[in-house]
């Protein structure tokens, strides 16, 4: 299982944290509340009125995943605090106070009347049902459901026809935009193109591109057509691209002429017989010189603007997201059209989106966050999405937040750390008064970043947790609730989360009756587990049924992440339960990197881990054992890095390579990455009795 969130516990470096705070005795005020020590935990108290939401009622007609349940059965707002006395903000972890942090007062009040969508968490936990959330969607005749229809056609056929759906900002060219009506027309054209090319319902359409309009049109047009959309990260090297195209059984690929040449797509097509069509975006004359491809814009220009959306069933496959594995090939997580129920609900309840908002999700659409929350969730709510094609630059990002009047900003800790490096004063040069909510996902969000958000933006940063497999946000810090920096938050209404005990082999403890042994005491570490049945839950790994079944036990989905839960129901991340590397929001499987390094004629063995990094979260580090005839020197080290970058792309290739005599393996031949990580970080090596003798 590949987590989309991970975080270090607060107080990883208590001494430096305390010393830092002692040097600045500035009082703390938060926009939504004064800060107080609450039950020996950091608490940001909301001043909002909490009333039950009578519009959402409890239902009993939910239709959770039959497959998941059968598997389980088979397996034994914000208001200012001006005028109030400041209070200290105290952090606590594992019964120890580990530091005091502070933040600047609110600079600007929130516009009057903007209350949170989720006003009372406890009341919503009782009132919420997935059945009611489903009825908030339009649906299709005879119980059908289609993500593309809910995100595009429903809005275009209603009051949002002339509302900008997608606004594209470019570093070099003028900005452009698509209204919901225009998006409906363009996605209908693309669906007609798929028909003309005889792409069948359920067949896979891959898109390899940056943040260009054609990507969004292709994604939504594919969903309207009833075929399956699968995004590819444009920074991938040739091998990860080919591997995913093969595993996914790609029928059609949309990419740019530049990426087609740079990634060697022409060569890999010879090895991909199922890939029948390639549509290229780019200069018409350049495309005309490339054999056996289609010009995307020519085909779109000939296609009709009307299309009857496919009457897909809720459980019909819609999305294929690849997530890296630790001991094998990437896994293709299958998601269905019913996922849109959770996308819309979490957009409302977690991200606090509402019609008319301007929303900026900075995630690349090549990753699941960029699809679920960069495309689907906001569009189902009639929101305007900002899309920027440039890399992070502090002044540019702040100008976007200012000029586009962004209301809700969903970003990653890596970006926030880079902004923090240039200082909060830079943010104060811009009018960011339109912002009412900031959320973060993808990697560790330490407590200081939460507080720094208050200093820089007048708002704290709200962390949340989910995985590729969960398809949507599962645990979050909500706008109306207390914030405990360093915490993942509390489960989404409609989600049952628990902590399961693990044995000495890091496996869940299963009782004689087949149930999981759950941990009830607060503060004790265990594996985070979720009760299956939410709409966006993955329905399988493509072609790997057994691998999917192993994700469930005792009636629960096993996330693979270790957590603890405090007395108030807040979850805190402890450690990963697998070896997947998270670098700048990218999920990297070590096996994939090791395999490429082993193709170099100098390499005998390779083991890869994630090394902590203050900006990227982690960077890829490889330990390489050379063949006897090769000498470990700096030239070879640089050559190996360059070799890996050519094959994997800079986002995946190792940042560091260390030559070693041998790579530790257990007696079954599996690389013991735990030991590599322990040696790198100077941690205890633990039990080494199962290791092969190292040379």
Specify the residue positions occupied by each region the protein language model found.
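Conserved AMP-binding/adenylate-forming
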Residues: 175-178, 192-236, 363-364, 587
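Conserved ATP/PPi-binding loop(s) of AMP-dependent carboxylate-activating enzymes
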Residues: 491-494, 504-550, 588, 683-685
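Structural core segment of the AMP-binding/adenylate-forming
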Residues: 94-110, 116, 220-298, 412
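Conserved AMP-binding A3 loop
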Residues: 176-181, 311, 318-342
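AMP-binding/adenylate-forming catalytic core of the ANL superfamily
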Residues: 239-246, 253-258, 402, 409, ...
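Gly/Ser/Thr-rich phosphate-binding loop
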Residues: 295-297, 406-411, 420-484, 492, ...
């Amino acid at each position: 299982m590949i987590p989309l969130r991970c975080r270090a516990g607060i107080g990883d470096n208590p001494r430096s944290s305390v010393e830092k705070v002692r040097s600045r005795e500035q009082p703390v005020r938060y926009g939504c509340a004064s800060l107080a020590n609450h039950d020996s935990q950091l608490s940001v108290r909301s001043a909002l009125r909490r009333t039950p939401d009578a519009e959402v009622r409890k239902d009993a007609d939910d239709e959770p995943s039959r497959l998941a349940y059968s598997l389980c059965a088979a397996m034994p707002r914000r208001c200012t605090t001006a005028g109030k006395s400041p209070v200290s903000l105290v952090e606590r972890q594992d019964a120890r106070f580990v530091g005091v942090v502070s933040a600047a007062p609110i600079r600007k009040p929130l516009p009057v009347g903007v209350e949170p969508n989720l006003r009372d968490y406890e009341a919503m936990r009782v009132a919420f049902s997935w059945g009611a959330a489903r009825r908030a969607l339009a649906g299709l005749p005879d119980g059908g459901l289609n993500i593309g229809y809910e995100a595009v056609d429903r809005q275009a056929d209603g009051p949002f026809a002339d509302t900008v759906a997608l606004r594209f900002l470019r570093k070099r060219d003028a900005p452009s935009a698509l209204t919901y009506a225009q998006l409906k027309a363009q996605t209908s054209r693309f669906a007609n193109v798929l028909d003309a090319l005889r792409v069948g319902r359920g067949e896979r359409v891959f898109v390899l591109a940056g943040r260009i309009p054609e990507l969004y049109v292709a994604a939504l047009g594919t969903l309207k057509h009833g075929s399956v959309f699968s995004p590819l990260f444009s920074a991938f090297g040739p091998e990860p691209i080919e591997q995913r195209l093969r595993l996914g059984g790609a029928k059609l690929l949309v990419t740019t002429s530049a990426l087609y040449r740079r990634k060697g797509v022409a060569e890999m097509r010879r090895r991909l017989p199922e890939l029948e069509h390639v549509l290229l975006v780019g200069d018409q004359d350049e495309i005309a010189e490339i054999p056996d491809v289609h010009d995307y814009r020519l085909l779109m220009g000939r296609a009709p603007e009307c299309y009857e959306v496919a009457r897909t069933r809720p459980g019909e496959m819609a999305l294929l997201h690849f997530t890296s594995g630790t001991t094998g090939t990437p896994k293709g997580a299958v998601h269905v059209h019913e996922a849109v129920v959770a996308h819309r609900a979490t957009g409302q309840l977690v991200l606090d989106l509402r019609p008319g908002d301007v929303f900026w999700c900075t995630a690349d659409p090549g990753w699941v966050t960029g699809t679920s929350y960069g495309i689907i969730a906001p569009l189902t709510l009639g929101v305007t999405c900002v899309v920027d094609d440039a890399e992070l630059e502090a002044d540019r990002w702040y100008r976007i937040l200012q000029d586009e009047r962004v209301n809700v900003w969903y970003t990653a800790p890596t970006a926030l750390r880079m902004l923090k490096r240039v200082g909060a004063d830079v943010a104060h040069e811009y009018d960011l008064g339109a912002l009412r909510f900031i959320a973060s996902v993808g990697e560790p969000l330490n407590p200081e970043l939460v507080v720094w958000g208050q200093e820089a933006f007048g708002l704290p940063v709200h962390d949340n947790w989910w995985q590729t497999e969960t398809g949507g946000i599962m645990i979050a810090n909500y706008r109306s609730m207390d914030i405990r920096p360093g915490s993942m938050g509390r489960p989404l209404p409609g989600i049952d989360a628990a902590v399961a005990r693990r044995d000495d082999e890091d496996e869940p403890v299963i009782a004689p009756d087949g149930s999981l042994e759950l941990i009830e005491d607060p503060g004790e570490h265990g594996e985070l587990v979720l009760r299956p049945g939410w709409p966006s839950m993955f329905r399988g790994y493509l072609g790997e049924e057994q691998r999917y079944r192993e994700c469930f036990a005792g009636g629960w989905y096993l996330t693979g992440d270790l957590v603890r839960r405090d007395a108030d129901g807040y979850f805190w991340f402890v450690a990963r339960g697998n070896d997947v590397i998270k670098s700048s929001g990218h999920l990297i499987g070590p096996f994939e990197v090791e395999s490429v390094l082993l193709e170099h004629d100098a390499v005998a063995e390779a083991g890869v881990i994630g090394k902590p990094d203050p900006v990227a979260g982690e960077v890829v580090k490889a330990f390489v054992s050379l063949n006897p005839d090769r000498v470990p020197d700096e030239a070879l080290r640089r050559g190996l890095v360059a070799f890996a970058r050519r094959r994997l792309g800079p986002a995946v290739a190792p940042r560091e390579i260390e030559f070693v005599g041998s790579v530790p393996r257990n007696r079954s031949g599996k690389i013991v990455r735990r030991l590599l990580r322990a040696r790198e970080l100077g941690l205890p090596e633990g039990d080494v009795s199962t290791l092969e003798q190292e040379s």
